Amino acid sequence: TQSRSSAASDVYKRQAWGLRARHLLKSKGYQVDDRWLETREATDAFKAEHGVKTTPQTFIDERRIGGFDDLRRFFGLRVRDPEATSYTPVLVVFAVTALTALAASHTAYGAPLTGRTIEWFISFSMCVLGMLKLQNLDGFATMFLNYDLLARRWVPYGWVYPFAETGAGVLMTAHALTWLSAPVALFIGGIGAASVFKAVYIDRRELKCACVGGDSKVPLGFLSLTENLMMIAMAVWMLARM
């Protein structure tokens, strides 16, 4: 038998997963014989020879371990479930927009915490969340139909919403056209909050939220409600200051 430090492993690859497999093996102390599959013909021949459907494939001491996920399991590491839900995308957005608001306040006023910091945090969040929805407008609109009360009655609202959220966020950041941006934010935030509350807390439905776009695995819940409540609070605040 060979010690881990000297054990030989072969990685057959033609894509980024091969680089990840090689990095993981080296981090575990393995010497890697990195064998590239340079052409489609070579890749197809390799798959046929070993009866596999994907590359890369890892072999340790002439024993086939499998693909990258199989390699992680071999080392006892967690393998991400592609269907698992997570609040991480929304939390990342809020963290980045909060830090950006602090930075903007520091630049504009010489202090990170000012009256504008919270305003900018909310308006920046609206802009980023709206932008994420706009990346896949059809996907968002379809997912939105699962729970939004207005979209279920008037389907085109699913395509209008991302533009309304982004536009209101931009105008609120600039404190421009408050007579337009605040009512828009109040309207879409109010409908959104009612929709999420009904779906989650009354109907007890387990749905995915379209808050970061149509392909997200974010569960519909408290953070989804928070997005809408922030828009409502921002709209009321700006209307009160007019």
Regions found by a protein language model. Give the residues of each.
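Membrane-interfacial helix-loop segments of redox and metal-homeostasis proteins
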Residues: E49, P89-M242
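Alpha-helical transmembrane segments of integral membrane proteins, especially early/N-terminal helices
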Residues: A16-W17, A21, P82-L91
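Structural micro-motif
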Residues: H50-I60, F68-D69
